[in-house]
Every structure is written in structure tokens, then in C-alpha cells.
């Protein structure tokens, strides 16, 4: 049985944090995870672990407002995604009588593929498709009368691999 682990979110200059820290050096080429009591002295950026459900507090109108790292496990493999301030995310809403997410955080998706199934009151099923290739970073359930989710997707064109 696979146990889904909640991802860890680390954010630059976090006001409320849980003590765990990550250091980013050389513009993201070096990532160091520090022990809870370990101090860092250097010129890198220090990111602090915050509650993962607060992810959307660091996104304003589709733009990431602070540098962040998301650490999650997909299929038993630990993945780390570094997202720089100013990165554009795609927010895709899914609303219906019943909403069934098909993808989870950390999933790589292709344009035109289904990310959620929507069921109407009559029982009709329709689907929400993604318009871009990318990675699902976060799913937010929005409290409302009808079930409502927002998928935060990092589009492929925002993923940059810097040459050394």
C-alpha cells in the first residue's frame, strides 16, 4: 500500500515557519538541507519550511512572490523543485457538483490531458483538460457550495535548466 506523503514547502523570508531550513547557493545550483538546530553562515538564500497548505499565499495573480522549494515524493522517488520569485504559474479551476482530481501534486502532465472529472447533479461526467505541458505543484480545495478545486501548474516553458 502506498502512503501519500504531504510535500514540504520551503519559502524565502517566511514569517511563520516550522524550524527546518534549506540553503540555496550559486543561483540554485547548490541546495543544502540543514538540520533543525544547524546555523548557516554564508551568502546563500535561506528558505524556511512552512505549512504546505499555505502555498497559495505565495502566489499573486499567477506569479510566485517569493523563492520556494517544494520537496515531494512521487512513486517512491524524492523530487525537489526550486521555483524562483517571478515565475508564472497557471491556475486551472475545476468546479462541479462532485469533483474528482485525476492528477496529484508532483505529476508531470501533457497539454490536452485530463486533470479532473466533474460530475453534474444529473450524473453527467465531463472533464477538465490542461492546455499546457507542465508539473502540478499544488491542488487547493476552495470551500464553496459546489465542490471547487484550483490546480496550480508550472508550465514547461517556465522550467529552465541553466548551462554551466
Curated annotation (Swiss-Prot):
Domain of life according to the entry = Archaea
Q: What is the name attached to this protein's record?
A: Uncharacterized protein MJ0859
Q: What is the lineage of its organism?
A: Archaea, Methanobacteriati, Methanobacteriota, Methanomada group, Methanococci
Amino acid at each position: 500500500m502506498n502512503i501519500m506523503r504531504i510535500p514540504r514547502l520551503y519559502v524565502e523570508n517566511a514569517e511563520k515557519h516550522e524550524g527546518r531550513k534549506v540553503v540555496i547557493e550559486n543561483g540554485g545550483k547548490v541546495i543544502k538541507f540543514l538540520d533543525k538546530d544547524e546555523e548557516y553562515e554564508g551568502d546563500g538564500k535561506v528558505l524556511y519550511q512552512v505549512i504546505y497548505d499555505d502555498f497559495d499565499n505565495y502566489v499573486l495573480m499567477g506569479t510566485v512572490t517569493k523563492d520556494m522549494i517544494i520537496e515531494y515524493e512521487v512513486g517512491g522517488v524524492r523530487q525537489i523543485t526550486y521555483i524562483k520569485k517571478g515565475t508564472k504559474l497557471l491556475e486551472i479551476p475545476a468546479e462541479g457538483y462532485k469533483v474528482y482530481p485525476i492528477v496529484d501534486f508532483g505529476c508531470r502532465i501533457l497539454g490536452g490531458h485530463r486533470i479532473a472529472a466533474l460530475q453534474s447533479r444529473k450524473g453527467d461526467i465531463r472533464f477538465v483538460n490542461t492546455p499546457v505541458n507542465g508539473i502540478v505543484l499544488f491542488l487547493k480545495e476552495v470551500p464553496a457550495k459546489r465542490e471547487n478545486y484550483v490546480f496550480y501548474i508550472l508550465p514547461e516553458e517556465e522550467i529552465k535548466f541553466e548551462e554551466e
